[in-house]
């Protein structure tokens, strides 16, 4: 988030907008909402202290690893309807999982469920890292790109250059932006 250990400019505003979207959206619109969470051990291999590329971030059980309060408040209505599933990624100390589909414990089941969907709306933080890798994972798991839409108003990037890179990647892979 903006003020986290791996700050992403504008992410709090994007998550506030996502919370409003969830508030305004009828429960019947989505069959299921999957929320992936970076959930790293304190000595994760991706951290600079361990020789990785990133500062320490999203350490499990810290506020860095959680969804924002505003999004969680709006998810509660969906959770009461049995429509939310949380997926942790990056829990293993020795390798990273940038995609929600990299978590081998849930990947096959998740891919199966997502293949059954008529449409998939995807959003999150950080677009060029976790969101883009999740999109790649969807395509690798034989999920049709034509039913995927990235909700850009709720997708935060590191900076304007990353935003351009992400938009180009989506266009190159025939993934719709809304």
Residues covered by each model-derived region:
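Short Gly/Thr/Asp-enriched flexible loops that form oxyanion-binding sites at enzyme active sites
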Residues: 131-141
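Active-site acidic carboxylates
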Residues: 1-87, 112, 116, 142-150, ...
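Glycine-rich phosphate- or other oxyanion-binding loops that anchor nucleotides, phosphorylated ligands
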Residues: 84-115, 119
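Short, small-residue-enriched loops and turns at beta-alpha junctions
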Residues: 94-95, 155-159
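Glycine-rich anion-binding loop/nest that anchors nucleotide
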Residues: 118-133, 149-156
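Histidine- and/or cysteine-centered catalytic micro-motif in compact active-site loops
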Residues: 38-39, 89-92, 125
């Amino acid at each position: 988030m903006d003020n986290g250990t791996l700050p992403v400019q504008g992410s709090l505003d994007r998550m506030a907008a996502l919370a409003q979207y969830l508030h305004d959206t009828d429960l019947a619109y989505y069959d299921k909402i999957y929320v992936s969470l970076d959930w790293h051990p304190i000595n994760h291999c991706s951290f600079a202290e361990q020789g990785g590329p990133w500062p320490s971030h999203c350490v499990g059980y810290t506020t860095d690893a959680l969804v924002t309060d505003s999004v969680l408040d709006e998810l509660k209505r969906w959770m009461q309807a049995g429509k939310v599933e949380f997926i942790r990624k990056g829990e293993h100390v020795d390798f990273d999982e940038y995609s929600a589909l990299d978590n081998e414990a849930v990947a096959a089941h998740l891919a199966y469920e997502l293949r059954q969907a008529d449409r998939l709306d995807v959003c999150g933080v950080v677009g060029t890292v976790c969101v883009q890798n999740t999109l790649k994972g969807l395509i690798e798991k034989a999920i049709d790109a034509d039913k995927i839409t990235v909700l850009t108003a709720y997708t935060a990037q590191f900076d304007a250059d990353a935003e351009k890179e992400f938009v180009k990647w989506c266009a190159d892979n025939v993934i719709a932006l809304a």
